[in-house]
Amino acid sequence: MAMLKYGGNAGRGGHQLTERTSEQVFAAREEAAAFFGGKPENTIFCLNCTHALNLAIQGIVQPNDHVIISNLEHNAVLRPVAAMVRERGVQCSIAPVSVDDKETIAAFRARIRPNTRAMICTLASNVTGQILPYRELAALCNEHDICMIADGAQACGTLPVQMSDGINILCTAGHKGLYGATGTGLLITDTKFPIKPLLYGGTGSLSAQVNQPEILPDKFESGTHNLLGIAGLNEGIKYVMNKSPQKI
């Protein structure tokens, strides 16, 4: 039924099916933005959290920049960072996470350098479930003009994660705490730190120009969306909003 209702290609036509599908994508974007306290145009649909994290990390960090990660990171963070260390001369420090939040914050603070570009950390560990003091870490980043990239895969939909917590770029999966389908993810940015696209191609907008559009979300959404997955993610977020707000 979803295929019959939302089987058009959003932004690529003017017939009824495509228009209905485009409206569904817009509605899902608004729902996700409202849930996390972001802006719809700054809410980017991705293939999964790994895709979102790669977009953020590779789009923000430049050669010879320094980044800080925690010792609890998923390979979705560790491997992109390791590749940039190996191939682009990026420097990386690993901050140990303690059961004492003050010690964790001190460990991150001690590793800040003049060329620190980003702090990339999970909000909650996928192994132990430990919740990092992400609001305090975000404040630390803001104090030093460092981009806070948050891996929210294990936290979003379970913890009350908001862009107002000081996160600059929030990356998350659709299929975990948001009850969406696999093959969906989100990146939400406050646009303080410009991101370079990871993919280039058709966006259904400004098709006569050879350069990638600068407007968001088009800049980061080349190619056909996972339209059925986005429709499911929209319903999942509505479920969390309507059925379990007291849990988050």
Please give the residue ranges for each predicted region.
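Pyridoxal 5′-phosphate
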Residues: 1-248
